[in-house]
């Protein structure tokens, strides 16, 4: 399971011209589910992301977590994170989880974040989405489990 996380001032996702999810200060998560991933990995990533101290304190030192600042999380499924670009010019998605498994684990991740009391918005699984964000920093991390 892979996640690209970005600290944002705001972020939103639009499907078919309609805003389906938006947040203010918080973290945008692009989540890719691969074959062999399970609930334990999704739960670990959820806890890791909301606990990472990537927000500035009074001294502007990265010392506060999403929970500490009362921020929100926008979760967007992105199977292309499972893409392998090592050979040729077209990515291979052989390592991506099948859609039904990807949806199940994406939903598990979202529920794990919500269970921790974090306000969470989402995109729509398998939809063609337009994601907008105002990156804060920029601060971006890649997490893999």
UniProtKB/Swiss-Prot annotation:
It is found in: Cytoplasm. GO terms for cellular component: cytoplasm. GO terms for biological process: D-amino acid catabolic process. Disulfide bonds: none annotated. InterPro entries: Daa-tRNA_deacyls_DTD, DTD-like_sf. Its main location: cytoplasm. Its EC number is 3.1.1.96. A motif (Gly-cisPro motif, important for rejection of L-amino acids) lies at residues 137-138. One of its GO terms (molecular function) is tRNA binding. Belongs to the DTD family. Homodimer. A Gly-cisPro motif from one monomer fits into the active site of the other monomer to allow specific chiral rejection of L-amino acids. PANTHER family: D-AMINOACYL-TRNA DEACYLASE 1 (PTHR10472:SF5), D-TYROSYL-TRNA TYR DEACYLASE (PTHR10472). An aminoacyl-tRNA editing enzyme that deacylates mischarged D-aminoacyl-tRNAs. Also deacylates mischarged glycyl-tRNA(Ala), protecting cells against glycine mischarging by AlaRS. Acts via tRNA-based rather than protein-based catalysis; rejects L-amino acids rather than detecting D-amino acids in the active site. By recycling D-aminoacyl-tRNA to D-amino acids and free tRNA molecules, this enzyme counteracts the toxicity associated with the formation of D-aminoacyl-tRNA entities in vivo and helps enforce protein L-homochirality. This is D-aminoacyl-tRNA deacylase. It comes from Pelobacter propionicus (strain DSM 2379 / NBRC 103807 / OttBd1). The gene is dtd.
């Amino acid at each position: 399971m892979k996640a690209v996380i970005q600290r944002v001032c705001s972020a939103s996702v639009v499907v078919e011209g309609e805003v389906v999810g938006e947040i203010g200060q918080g973290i945008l998560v692009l989540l890719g589910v691969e074959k062999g991933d399970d609930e334990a990995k999704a739960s670990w990533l959820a806890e890791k992301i909301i606990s990472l101290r990537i927000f500035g304190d009074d001294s502007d030192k990265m010392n506060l977590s999403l929970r500490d600042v009362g921020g929100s999380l926008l979760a967007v499924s992105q199977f292309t994170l499972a893409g392998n670009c090592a050979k040729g010019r077209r990515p291979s998605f052989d390592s991506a989880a099948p859609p039904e498994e990807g949806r199940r684990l994406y939903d598990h991740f979202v529920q794990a974040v919500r269970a921790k009391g974090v306000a969470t918005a989402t995109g729509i699984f398998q939809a063609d989405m337009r994601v907008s964000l105002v990156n804060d920093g920029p601060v971006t991390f890649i997490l893999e489990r």
